[in-house]
Amino acid sequence: MFQFDTSKLEWTHFEGGPHFDYHIDYAIAVLGAQPDIGVLDLLVKWAPNAYCHYHRHLAATTTLVLEGEQNLYEVGDGGEAIHKVRKAGDYAHSPGGDLHMEQAGPDGALIFFGFQSPDGRLFETLDKAH
C-alpha cells in the first residue's frame, strides 16, 4: 500500500465551469523541479469520476498510478478515439505529443507524473477543436 503523506503538500486545485460538458475536478502538487535540465515531477489527484482539461503533453512523460484508476482518452492519428485504463501500480512512458483527457475511476485517482523537456515546454491545454 502507498504510504506517502500527501496532506503536507501544497495543492493547486482546478475545476471546470458551466462552459464544460464534463466534470473537471483535480489538484496538482509539485514534488520537485530542475528547470535548468527541464525536469518536473508532479502528483495529481482527481475526485471520483472527474476529468482534467483536454490537453497534449509536449514533454516526454513518465506516469505511475499510485491509487485508484486512470482512464485515458486519446485521439489516434486517424482521429479515432482510444480508451486505455491504468490501475494502481501501472507504469507508462510516452514521448509526448498525444491529444488526450484523463478521468479518474469511481474511487478517484492519485498519479505521479515525471516530465522531461529540454526546452521547458510541458503541455498545452486545448479545446475540442484542438
PLM region descriptions:
Residues 42-44, 52-57, 74, 83-84, ...:
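Short histidine-centered beta-strand/loop micro-motifs
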Residues 30-37, 48-60:
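Active-site region of the double-stranded beta-helix
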Residues 35, 76-97, 104-105:
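Short acidic-glycine-tyrosine-enriched beta hairpin
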Residues 57-77:
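Glycine- and acidic-residue-biased ligand/ion/polar-headgroup-sensing regions
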Residues 1-38, 83-84, 126-130:
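A short, N-terminal "cap"/entry segment at the start of jelly-roll beta-barrel domains
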Residues 50-53, 71, 90-102, 119:
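Histidine-centered metal-chelating micro-motifs
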Residues 80, 101-130:
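Double-stranded beta-helix
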Residues 28-30, 41-45, 62, 83, ...:
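Conserved hydrophobic/aromatic beta-strand scaffold that supports enzyme active sites
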